Each structure stands twice: as C-alpha cells, then as structure tokens.
C-alpha cells in the first residue's frame, strides 16, 4: 500500500519533498518577511474605497431666469447625458444664470473613462447647446477629494487679524502641497487679502479724470515682462522686468497725470484700503471644556480658555488615490510643526480638527491587537487539547497564512482597513482546521506504529487528503458569491470576498507542506514513546464517550 501511495499520489510526492528538504523552512521565512513588508507598505484606511464616478457639469447662461435655464439647458442636457453607457443617475439644479448637472456612474466604473465619455458626449452634441450658453465645465468628483487632515488656524488677536490668518494659511498650504501624495487642498474661512480703491467722484471731476483713466494707469504700472532666464548651479532662474505693485503704498503712489507741473497720484483722488475681500461666510472656532485634550501642532503659548471663541482659517488636505492616509497625515503634520515659529507666528494656534490618518491607524492597530489576542487564545486552546508541540505546529499556519494574504492584498491593490482585518479574524477559526486534522492524524499514526515515522506521516496526510481538500473548497465556494454583490456594498465587502478564500487556500497549501515538515521534526522524537501497546481506537476514552452517547 505504501509503495502504491508513493508512486501514484501527487500529494504524497509533494509532502515527501517538503518534509525531507529545506523548502518548508524557506517557505516559512520568505512568507513571514513578505508579510512584514506588506504590512508596512500596504496603504491603511478606515474603510475600503468605493469608486463611484460623479461628474458635475457647470453651465453658465447669463441673463436667463431659473425657468428658462431649466427649459432651454437643464432638461435637454439631462436627456443627453442619460444616453452615456454606464450612467446610473442624473441630478440637476437650475438657478438664475446657471445650471449644475451631476452625472453619477455605476459603482466600479473607471473615473478617467467616465470623464472622457462625459466630455465627448458634450463635444459631439455642441449643436444642441443653446446660443445663450456662454460656457460649460466638467469637473470630476471622487472620494479622495474628502480631506483627511483639517488644520485650523486661530489667533487671540483682535478682529483685524482675520485677514492675516488667511494670508498665513495661503502661504502654509503652498508649502504643504509639496508633501508627497498630497492631493486636492484648499483654504476655508477668513477673507483673502484685497487692496480696495474707493475713488472720490468730486476729486475725479475736479481733476478731469474718469474711472477708465484709473484702470489704464494701474494696468501700465503693474506689468511683469519675461526677459529671459539664467542657468546656474543646476537651477534655472526666470528674469522678469517692469513695474509691479508689492503693497498698497505703491498702489496709492500710482501717477495719474501732471497738473501744473505737479504729479497727481491715485491716493490724492481715492481712498486705498489694504484689507479683506467681501465676506460671504464667517468661520469661528469655539473652545469647550476639553480644550486641554485637543491636538495642537507646535504650540508653546497658553491654551485658550473654555468658552472662548476666535476667528479661524482652516486648511483642508486630501490625499491622492491609492496613497497611505497614515503616512500622508504624518508628513503634513511634521512639516507644519517645522514651520511653526517661522512661517507661522508663535501667537497663531494650530489645531488639528480632523486627522483621518490617525483615526485609521488607531482602528487598524486596535484590530491588529484583537487579532493577536485571538491567535494567542487559539494557541492556548490547542495546547490544552492537543499538547504543546502539536499546538506549536498548528500555530505556524496562522502567521504564515496572514502574511501571504497581506502580500496578496498589496499586490492586488487592496488596502488594510476594518473590513480586511475583520476578514482575517473571521478566517482565523477556519484556517487552523486543515493543520489540526493533519497533526491529529499524524499523531494517531505515530501512536499506531505500523510504519516507520516518515512513511507513517505520508500515509496519515494521504488519508485525510480528500476530505481536507473538499472541506476547504466548500468554505471557499461559500464566499465566492460575495464577489457578485452589486451597488456600493460590492466594493465595500470585496476585501471579505478576497481575503477569506485566499487565507483558506493558503491554509490548505501549508497543511500539505509546512505542517508535515514541522510534525516530522517535532513529533518524530515522540514516536512510540509512552505507549507499551499499539493504539486501540475502541479502548480510547473518546470512543467510549461517543459510544455511550449514541447508545
């Protein structure tokens, strides 16, 4: 029988090869190293990414009422955009002088191809666009546009510092955009700086000046001309020449004309105000009792008092698609801390009002901790039921399976998120089944002592081969239908449908390679030890208990 098994069974040939060589040890080391690398390199997110391409079409119709915009532009545009392959919904808003049409594609559609299809459809039907339409614009909307970091700048200075906060925020965001994998970013709150000119009609009339004269004078005195470049030290410097304004004082010093040999400046006929632009929104930050627990960046000044309110400017930072939210957030905060005290004054308080990178990292680390506790629990239970050596053999399958599964996640573009780790926790109780059956049957054959240790191991593995393979693929097939879930739940549950079958398949491979190798190395010394008689199934305690229950 043994000779036939050795000659005919492919499984036995594989088991013999991995048991008698160093391939299993090599497989063990490579899988653990690859898993450690994948754990560090795979992007971390709080939830799986759901790709739902949405295109916003902005249409300008100057002078048209909301009803005219709806009849002439919005309704025909909705009909046209619904004809695009892959479009699921079309929404629209009509306002006086403008319309916004949102085109939502099916979940999983490619963002770039959806953008191209939308633009091509509009370009191919320009003859249907009413002459009253002055301009249209297509802008894609994606999940990565949601900011992962919000930095709020506030100051205890009086209200006049609101514009200064915006100026600091604009300079800071220009530096933060240099961080790798920083995507869309913008500033919210605090009106931007604007130099306003308020001409005095009486003085203009006395000087025989008009508003176009002022516009022409400003245009002539604010010119930047490109005159060439200079290359030195591997840098190319752009040379510009011409008069230009650096501050409000220079704007006021603009010469309008000469009257009686005396120069007439802009400040003589107009009021120049270096202040804020027209404000259509106000942003403030209030500090409550938990002010001492809030996260700040590089703050050395006393914290605000509970109940205090301040003007605020907020910097919103989003990440690029597929990048690691944790590393992007850490780099943004690190650079911000370096700039505190130089670009950012000491009296400006930087508060981290959102940090999805830290949130994702905390939740992933928390699940990893629970996963480690689950692995430890299984090892203890196996040690109590099978024995220490047997539990050690079975426990090898857990880190190896998870390591290679994480590597597959990295290679196939999946991220480490809550659903991914939940899939690993779910598969934990399933993936040890094959090694347990393997070790238990090898242990039984070593007790029977009918064959030499190596041959007994091969016979034991071959005996449980059909049910092990069948049971593993039965579990795999039960998770395959999750690949066909439609809608937003499809990509959300995709890590579950991917990770559990991969983990089960790897546990089967390990049961036929590493588990026999470890069993042969660790259990061979116990072959026949402590057993004076051949193992008798009917005399075992378990057999008698089951027999009594069935009777």
Label each region the model flagged.
Residues 44, 48, 67, 386, ...:
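Short helix-terminus and kink motifs of transmembrane alpha helices
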Residues 380-385, 402-419, 469-520:
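Hydrophobic, glycine/alanine-rich multi-pass transmembrane helices and their short helix-loop junctions
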Residues 316-320, 440-450, 483, 520-522:
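Helix-loop junctions at the membrane interface of multi-pass solute transporters
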Residues 1-26, 448-449, 454, 458, ...:
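Interfacial helix-loop-helix hairpins and adjacent transmembrane helices
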Residues 2-375, 416, 491:
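Membrane-proximal extracytoplasmic
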Residues 37-41, 376-444, 484, 502:
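Hydrophobic transmembrane alpha-helices and their membrane-interface caps
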Residues 353, 360, 364, 439, ...:
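Helix-loop junctions and hydrophobic alpha-helical segments within the transmembrane domains
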Residues 23-28, 365-377, 397, 401, ...:
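Hydrophobic alpha-helical transmembrane segments of multipass membrane transporters and ion channels
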